[in-house]
Structures are given as C-alpha cells and as structure tokens.
C-alpha cells in the first residue's frame, strides 16, 4: 500500500491591500490554521503564524509581518505551534490594537 502526504494548495499571496476598507467581508487563508478577516476595514487575524515556525512548512505564508499595516485584533485560540508564534505576536504588537487569548496563551505572549 502506498502512503502519500496530503498537501493543501498554495495560499494566494497578498499584502497591505488586504487590510483596506471594503464594502463586505473577506476571509483570507494564512496557511496552516490562520486566517485574516476583513469586515468593512476592521481587520482580525486569527491564529497568525507568519514567522517563527519550528519545522519546515508544506506551504509558504501568503503574508509577511512587514506587510501588516494594522490589525484591530489578534485572536489566539491555543498554544499549539500551528496556531501560535511568539515571534509573530512580538513583531505584530506595534500594529495591533488588542490581543485576545485564553489565560494560558496570554501568559505566553507576555513572556
């Protein structure tokens, strides 16, 4: 029996334009478990792992930290390495209005 590694399609790269005000709501896949939700210019990053991943990735991140002009909030669901990156949290802090996470994950962000 042959075993194969399933691989998701490569995410579509995007940059600062994805954060602009718009008429509706757009959800963009960040690769892995993450997403960017832009609802009429309110931008929420969910489980962004844009850097600091501790193993090779099967797909490249479609967004770089330096291309995030602002985020109204970052939601961190839990601390598994495909949902949480200290490096990403640290580097997005200057452009992020608020972080929301369970108490344990919030403590990791402060470390």
Residue ranges, per PLM feature:
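Phosphate- and divalent-cation-binding pockets in alpha/beta enzyme and binding domains
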Residues: 83, 91, 107-111
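Metallo-beta-lactamase
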Residues: 2-23, 101-111
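Active-site-adjacent beta-strand anchor residues
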Residues: 30, 99-102
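A generic "binding-loop/recognition-motif" signal
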Residues: 33, 80, 105
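Short loop/turn positions at the edges of beta-strands in beta-sheet-rich folds
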Residues: 29-31, 40
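Short active-site oxyanion
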Residues: 24-26, 94-99
